Amino acid sequence: VPCQNSACHGDLRCGQQGGIPMSEMPAYIQDILDLIEWANGDARKTKWGKVRAESGHPKPFNLKYIGIGNEDLITDIFEERFTMIFNAIKEKYPEIIVVGTVGPFNEGTDYVEGWKLADKLGIPMVDEHYYQSPGWFLHNQDFYDKYDRSKKTKVYLGEYATHIPGRKANMETALTEALYLTPFQASCK
């Protein structure tokens, strides 16, 4: 899944609280649309499909998903720019599943606001990330059992890890991650 910047961070000019200037958003959105055309476009009929073919890959990649944002703070700036990108992708490529973000943690304001935005826009999937202690993983094996299955938005758990002080990995962290993942099979309905 290619993950594109939400136009709110990762840009050296503005930091996570800033955003690409609104005057630059149309060009930025076009770059994302061009990426999708490059991945999926017909090599005989599209500009970017032709570039892909000339670069040695004549067949489309059949891209189905694209991530927009990664651990963003869910601010008004984020919401405005994400919504512009999301709507442009849905308009031009309705078959593409946009994977949104619900902030850098699995709790707190950004998580709550990220889910509100997902519900409001009907984002098909969000990428949750979390890094927790072994105790958290042991005591939250039912985390996704509580997930409301009637929601349109599904969860993609793109990043997770058990951390102990110093962020070292050892047998304890490996086993708690394995124990945490065991009930996922039942939760993935």
What is each residue range found by the language model?
Residues 1-118, 131, 135:
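Substrate-binding cleft and catalytic face of glycoside hydrolase catalytic domains
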Residues 88-90, 94, 115-118, 124-189:
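Catalytic-core region of carbohydrate-active enzymes that cleave or remodel glycosidic bonds
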Residues 64, 123-124:
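Short, conserved active-site loop motifs that form the nucleotide-linked donor/cofactor pocket
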